[in-house]
Amino acid sequence: RVAIMNECIDSSMAERRRMGIEMLETALGGPPWTGFGINEFGARPRDYGFRPSYDELVAWLFAFIDILVRLGTSGVPELEDDARRILADKFRWIWRHGGIRSKLIDAARKLHAHRPWGEGWKAVRSTIYFFHTKRKDNEDVEPLPEILVTLERELEPKDLVSAIMAYVLSNRRDFWALDADYEHQGTNKFSEIRKILCAKAFKLGHEFAVSSHGLDELCPNLFLRDGMPYRVEFGKGLANGAPDLRIYWQQLVIQLDLQHKSQRDVSVIRGFIEETHSIDSALAQELLDQCAQHSELRFELVNLHPWQEFTEIDLDRCMSLLDDSDIQPHMYGAILWGEQFSNLPESRVLELAQRLLSKPNGDEVVLEALSMKLADKGDATDTLGLALRTIGISAAIQRFQRDHNDLGGYLDYAMERVIDATLRFDGNEAEKLEWLNTIFAVVDEHFGYIYSFEDAIGITAAWMPKEFLSRIFDGTEDQQQRRLHFINHDDSHQSPIAKIDVDILIEWCRTTKDPQVWASVASGINLWSKDGEQSPICLQDDALRFLEASPEPRAVLEIFAEHVAPSSWFGSRANVMQPRVEAIGQLVTHERADISKSARAVYEKLTDWVEKEKERERLEDEALEQRFE
């Protein structure tokens, strides 16, 4: 493993070097090390991964710690950073093994002697906190080793730059490791720690600005896109302590331009402008005008504005970039919903929203923004208002027409919120019908296969039930077949008409005076319910009420029977089907003779189906056993 790993790390190919680093990281990630592969019963031994004896483990960890020290002092910045990060991440895990502690301390000292190891200092402090401070009231807790206290003092940042690297320019979230005197108690402990660390970052920024240090000493970390949450406060501190704001601004921009484009984060710039605004607002406006012209800062222009006061002048500055082809519309989303933008005239916000719809993916930005605006607002309040509701449903129509792919369902959530807020209030009647027509136009186009935006479609059916049901049975024969397929549910996809109240379904079916629609609508009703893990499966009350209201219960029961077989399952399919069959079998004793008679006939067919399925599974199992023999 060491030979292969070293070959990868020494490779000229970036992907192989990354693979070598990952091998090094996983080598220190156990035990246990879990094996991957086929573990089914058979003639081969199962692979449970490497399970070393204690002596083997010590030898293993010694070898890989030596490699980490070699890489961490190699003089190659990329390798040094990776090695130092890995050992910091694994320090607390490795410290549990007493026989390796002296090796671990020696490695920490070597890395720190090469250059200050702030990540290691935080790793040591978190080890002290979790293994000792947090467990101080436990009887079986190990006394705090003096050698660990000594190591913590040795690794603690002693100069300004190393302190900034540890407190500000590090992506580790060891809140408990950064303030030894803080009592980590109470429901607000993390927000309190954040306040302390923000104040610390501001102070460090001020001290750095008044010092003789240059910004190049903090790069590239100062602008790395790597989740360092205190750089805004650090930027504020820089502005607060800068002897000359203009000159320091120019130095910041120069250092930003020297960094690789893909790695740039402008949080420090944002903090600098925000503090400048509190010192000299006219200068802050001048800096923002420069940002609008900068090749990189223009992409973050909205976020660079001080949030305490966002004016129409600021909006004009931001919107002046909107028609540029390389500007992403996501930058503007917060303006539509954020409290810090609430002082803007409604007409200007509507203008922005309307223009966003003409941008690529602008419809998604509008939907997500309006969803955020609706967050935590009561359903009875018309938060959006007529104009924003019009834009919101237009965004939904535009996005749904474009494609119906929504991996993860996040956009479906946003669209469902906007559609719900639009359909529940009067007005927008033309847009509501256009939205409904769009749904079925897309259904027709995709032959009834729509597996995204289920919640948005479902809430539409709930608010416009009669119109929704009527659309299913409108159109040509081909269109009706596609739409009936669309409402037919299975175990993995709920039918949109399942969101419609069963009383409305029954009333609508009765008004059509067409007995055949009952069976079609029945295909979308949720059938099975279960009170607890040990309780038997039974028909849902809504399904039973629909069956009892139907003029032809046999046809409805036949549809129910089609949903006895699961669309996916683990183990025996017959075992999944059996309790569902028994749920239908309970209807044999129904008080109505027509339902009882129909249930008996359907139950007999289903019982035969289950027996055939059991036989098929038995033959399949025998074949597998013979193959093993």
Task: Report the location of each language-model feature.
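Non-catalytic all-alpha helical scaffold/repeat segments
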Residues: 1-629
